[in-house]
């Protein structure tokens, strides 16, 4: 229920109308039943439950927005036409929104060395030029567990982090110098801004039922709602894909993948490329550099790298950090509100949240998983 199907178990089987271990009519019918069951659960349980609870938590439509009403990033995915990544083909859009300007969508080019750069000023890594940002093709992952200025305590018992401290094993990726949020909310808002019909209809329906404006999407509950709406859309898309798969097989089209560049011996000795995807948690990119026929560098910038990133040289906060600013906590030693906002990102990591008093005394420590 994260917004998209995982098809590895299917794709590796191959396509053929014959019986045996390959995908045949029996398997197609089985997959269709899974798609229908998924739609049934989402439409009869997941979505109604969320919409039933939303009126009791309307204040969470105003909390936890962070970067969501400012900077959003999507790589685009799910082309409906084979090998066509144009805007008319993509179900999930490509683009970036900066400073909350929904009427100004910027194209995202993952091969442009100036668009995406990672910084390590507040991370436990080192670069030859400490303040410089590196495009993933030039990326360096060289650990250096150094606490930095302003830190009180030891490496095994940190008491206080200063503004100049290093505090994360995550780098700080930035798009054209901006901290970005990525994920279902970014995709749904970008699609809404582009007036893509399926997403626009889903968002308008949900907002109407909840009795809130579009601005409510930029929040903790809006982030949770976006994931549910995307699940509705992708479950329907999964059923459509099954029907298309069956039609292709019946028409004699048994091609399962573009094999044009599958054989490594056909590649240049030196080349570089990038493999992007819109994963459940957001924009995912793997950048690869090949020299002398072998991999010389491989860098992955995953959705949680964007969302959980630490500060950058400009002091810009990552999406998690920005979303927690201004969050009211009713009981200091039971900070459920912090958990609620971080969980809305669906984090793929475990982290500790320390709640401190204004005097610097630790009130509690909560593991976020």
Regions found by a protein language model. Name each.
Residues 284-300:
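Short beta-strand elements
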Residues 1-281, 292, 302-369:
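Active-site bordering "gate/hinge" segments
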